[in-house]
Amino acid sequence: MSWIFSSNILLPKATDVKVTEIVVKKRKRRMYLFSGNEIIKSYKIDLGFAPEGHKKFEGDGKTPEGSYKIDRKNRNSKYHLSIGISYPNSKDQYFAKLKGKLPGGDIFIHGTDKPFRWFQKDWTAGCIAVSNNEIREIFNLVRIGTPIFIEP
């Protein structure tokens, strides 16, 4: 694997592999990168501190479920690097509004704020966490616009 420097962070150099979608299986605590019908990478993940069920409101500690897209990348994340997920979508916003609440937002795939990953209980506010080495790889492989499907 080749490497490139970016904002003082060493990133793996992109390969010819095109990630066509991301699938998250919350119960299994796994995230899969697909190229067509082939799984090209699999990662152990941590989720929101209250992971059961779909995220409905700001502060509920749940990781969303449903179909979203990767909508941004952040090289200056508190959690090493981060990749934005397009939560909330219009359905999420509508449901929260009906209940008189905010749906929350700023849901990301990210690394940790530690030099290495502590395998611990789910700890994020609703995000999907991987190790810092893994987020460097994911950050370089995944493009803005990539679909992400988050399953229970």
PLM regions and their residue ranges:
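Exported/periplasmic cell-wall-interacting domains
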Residues: 72-152
